[in-house]
Amino acid sequence: MNLTKKFFRVIAFVLFAVIALQLPVVALARELQPGITDNAISTTLSGDDAHILSEDATLRDEYTKHFVLSDGSMLAASYSVPVHYYKNDEWKDIDNTLVSENAKTGSDIRGFVNTESGVKYKFAQSSAEAALLEMTADGYSVSWELVADKNMVAASVTNPEEQNGNSDDDILNGNKNISSVKYINILNDTDIEYILRGNDVKENITVKSAKDNYTYSFRIRVSGAALVLKEDGSIDIVKGGETVKTIPAAFMTDAAGAYSADVETTLVTESDGVYMLTVTADKTWGNNAQF
């Protein structure tokens, strides 16, 4: 009797992760299932039986909000994903709600951009665009193109849920710092998903059937910076001789939570500012399907 194996494998990249935020990046890499995950919140309450009146924005940092309570005490809420970005000498709310935007120039893509953040991300409205992802920050930009015989698919966007209530839970969970874009079956039995969390984005390649190989290539165009491949498979984005961001090494997970770092990464310079990134996941591990 023939049995059909039902499984998926995920090859994941944490893209454009700020070097200074290695701990959040490590935590993200341990989230083995694809999709949006909730903010983890820890709170420190200095009073009992009180409710939130307002936020004291002067006490903000990247991960923390402080709330004034009805009894005059304070509540500090710390989040696992950045909720603020720094601009013009103040911490502002991150809003990663994705909204439609047409191409601004001849080389731009039509897609969806995050509303307010220290980093601008734009995701293609469909696989027909010249790139799946564009990132702009601090005087440089990076675009990310899947080089393959792609199927024609539209982007599936998941935005943060609106919190319209005034309860303490609504206020504490009202951040809009996580969203996602998925290209379902952009390759045969393969999805590509981008999860935007704070100022970082994670790419999941979800493989839903066994393949002859697990090799994926991306053309990366960089303006105002350069890419440097490290021995551990990570890639530094270097500007003015300094590493400003990094793309950590790819890894694999499956539906059962198994993990493997057996992924080969190559980076070839095609021309000035244009690179070909190729990742090849271990075939034996990839074909070891779970029932």
Predicted segments, located by residue:
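N-terminal hydrophobic targeting signals that begin at the initiator methionine
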Residues: 1-4
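Sec-dependent N-terminal signal peptides
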Residues: 6-20
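Intrinsic disorder/low-complexity segments enriched in polar/small residues
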Residues: 6-7, 23, 163-164
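Sequence-pattern detector for short linear motifs
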Residues: 8-12, 27, 33
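C-terminal segment of classical bacterial N-terminal signal peptides
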Residues: 19-28
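Residues that cap or anchor secondary-structure elements
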Residues: 30-291
